[in-house]
């Protein structure tokens, strides 16, 4: 069983998504059975708390973030859709890999924004990203998903604080 892992695309407005189309073409060529996106597919800079109030923050808009995420996902998935349309027309086998996506801390900015300002509840949500409509099975931020005996998560936490674990090597060499 072959897995293909896509980490941290961090799609944002103004970005060129040609690289995602190339990844999609590679997927069609190699046909891994399972594709795992490890989160932060969308960057969501409009919801970043890092540089709020700074000049560089002005002009960021939630709707533009969502649009960028959709454009990026379309770039990634278009080669698969095009391949399957040709295959269907020619009565050939279509390529239907399992698609798994763990939400990352950048997507989680949506939840944090709602928790910080309850007026946003019902106005913005993970559903705006529409990952499921693109065929992905979506897992909550920091959930560990085991696929074919391999554990996947946006990052693995350590201790009670929920901080990211250090490298595997550091974990193994802890005394």
Predicted regions and their residues:
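Conserved catalytic scaffold of divalent metal-dependent phosphoesterases
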Residues: 68-175
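N-terminal active-site segment of His-dependent metallophosphoesterases
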Residues: 1-74, 87
């Amino acid at each position: 069983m072959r897995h293909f892992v896509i980490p941290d695309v961090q799609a944002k407005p103004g970005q060129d998504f040609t690289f995602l189309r190339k990844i999609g073409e590679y997927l069609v060529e190699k046909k891994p059975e399972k594709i795992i996106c490890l989160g932060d597919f969308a960057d969501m800079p409009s919801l970043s708390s890092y540089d709020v109030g700074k000049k560089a923050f002005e002009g960021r808009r939630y709707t533009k973030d969502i649009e960028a995420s959709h454009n990026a996902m379309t770039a990634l998935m278009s080669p698969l859709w095009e391949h399957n349309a040709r295959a269907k027309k020619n009565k050939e086998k279509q390529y239907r890999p399992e698609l798994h996506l763990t939400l990352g801390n950048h997507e989680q900015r949506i939840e944090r924004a709602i928790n910080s300002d309850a007026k946003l509840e019902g106005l913005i949500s993970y559903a705006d990203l529409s990952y499921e409509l693109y065929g992905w099975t979506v897992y909550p931020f920091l959930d560990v998903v085991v696929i074919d005996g391999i554990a996947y998560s946006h990052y693995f936490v350590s201790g009670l604080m929920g901080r990211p674990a250090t490298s595997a090597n550091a974990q193994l060499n802890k005394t």
